Amino acid sequence: HDSDSLDSNSITISKGISLVANALAEIKPDLFIVYADRYEGFAALIASTQMGIVTAHFEGGDITEGGTFDDSVRHSMTKLAHLHFTTNEDATKRILQLGESQENVFTVGLPSVDLIKASEFSDEDELVKKYGLKNINNIIVFTQHPIPIEKDNISKEFESIENAFKNLRLTNLKIICTFPNSDIGGKEII
């Protein structure tokens, strides 16, 4: 299925609900944990809550600015979940404003920070060699994620990006571009 079509998220969510429901029916968990605001997680959360499985949601109450579906998906996930683990006090307040019980909301910080701290990364010499850099201080890592509800503006965004890159070519900076996420419009960016 074309992941850049406007119906792709809906189709992915519907398939995800079915697949996760089948898996949950087989393993019968006492608790299901889901993370953040992605449509794949939304599908899993719908399946778990509709099956009566206690569901914990991490990163509810956060805000993403800039025309994505993230906030509406995240807030929907929050309303469906039973337990809430937030990244900050503002997120906790938002969840409480949505009517969730204070006894089910816990401010725990951002779990991925712990993973980053526990991970081993390449040292400076490895990075310089791997990417052909003169040194690590002269790089820009660039990622452009699509904004699904503004898919028609991607070419206009690229004009601005292209102009910025032209100006950066005059410097001694090296630009490393990464792939976008899989949201609608990602293929066009690639």
Regions found by a protein language model. Give the residues of each.
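Generic hydrophobic alpha-helical segments
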Residues: G16-L24, L127, I161, F165
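Short, glycine/serine-rich, charged loops/turns that create anion-binding
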Residues: Y39, D62, S112, I147-P148, ...
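A nucleotide-sugar donor-handling region in carbohydrate enzymes
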Residues: S3, L80-I154
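General structural feature for long, well-ordered alpha-helical segments within catalytic domains
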Residues: G16, V73, T87, A91, ...
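Conserved catalytic-core segment of nucleotide-activated headgroup transferases in glycan assembly
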Residues: K129-T178, S182-I189
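Short beta-strands and strand-loop turn motifs
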Residues: H1-S3, T55-G60, G109, V141-P146, ...
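Active-site and donor-binding regions of nucleotide-sugar-utilizing enzymes
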Residues: D2-Q102
